[in-house]
Amino acid sequence: MKKSILTLIIISLFTIQSFAQPRADALVLYRNGKYAEAIKICEQEIVEDPQNIDSYCVLCWSLVRNRQYAEAEQRSAEARKINSTDVRLIEIQAEAKFYLGKNTAALELFQYYLANVPANGSRIGNAYYYMGEIYIRQAKYQHADISFSTAVHTEPLVDYWWTRCGYAREMTGNYNSALEAYSKAIELNGSNSDAIRGRERVVAKLR
């Protein structure tokens, strides 16, 4: 009898402990690069609360970082049926479309994001960077220069953005400004081979 009671107590304590364990934080998982795990948690949260926009945002961020672009596009569209003006959803939907090669749609969404996001928005620099890449794809190099220049003004410590800014300027024939951008990229990251080659090209053209 005593053994049976003891067994029941142990089972009860184990059950209580299991239910008491908090679910992993999807945002923390995302920030730690555990995208697949974050996706699973977000999917569970959305099943429990289909109106949970925060879960949709983390889900879509994780899908994009996990290179599941088509699914990110689909899920962000679902979320925007619930809240069409959430700037986080607008921006990540634009990213998904960018990676799917849907340049016009992505550009329109990035522009819409920038028109509506507060001045302290965390993805402003990224939006301008992606716009610059779209303009490069479209061979609109002056537009690309403007976008990349705004991106590096917003976040001046990203060496790759300076490299792309240098490339856009190089393609417009603005070699002095291209040299400045490539040099800044190398200053931030001395092993940036694209920036090193870019600087060599424009230095040769300036001779």
Language model regions located:
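Register position in tetratricopeptide repeats
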Residues: 31-32, 65-66, 99-100, 133, ...
